[in-house]
Amino acid sequence: MKTLITYFLTGLIYLLMSSCHIAPPKMIDNPTPVGVPNSTDLQEYKTAYFASGCFWCVEAIYESVYGVEEVISGYAGGTTVNPNYQQIGTGRTGHAETVEVYYDPSKVDFKTLLAVFFNSHDPTTKNRQGPDSGTQYRSIAFYSNDTEKKIIEDYVAELTRDQVFDKPIVTEIKQHTIFYKAEEYHQDFEKLNPLHPYVRQISIPRLNRFKAKNPEILKESK
């Protein structure tokens, strides 16, 4: 019996450490909505919004793309006002972990960022990415205008026609309304916490797989 309990506890600890969840050092009850760039340096850039699983992973992926100037982790797609990480974790806010991507349209376009989205996660799994499950991890491609909506719809139709994936795409195509910036400790999480078990086991391998498949759109290594 003790052996079974030991195995159970070991497995539980491993599961918790290998999921996109941490006990926050300090919970911010009301994250600031990011309707405009926090820095005037970003005002000249366009924005795009994507949800494709744990935002620690997604932020790092988009940060690696040429033409992307900044990526902010946050929450979007739901109805709860000023959600925090604890609320998001319940899966009942309607929001998904989302990234806000600031990009230079003279260097990279929206369609390329959309290709990054579909090429860096599994859009056929409903409410799940890797070890993370719940509506907060669902796949969403947000659009801010009719042009972006058509680009997304056409791209999904193309992927479906070419049978790129073995199963139907379940990505939501959703109008962007408001984006809430996540707590500060989530920003640049992968970069600042390279030894975190989830980062080592899930985030970094996911980033490296993306880089290996898409060397032509990456920033030059410094």
Where do the protein language model's features map onto the residues?
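Bacterial N-terminal signal peptides
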Residues: 7-19
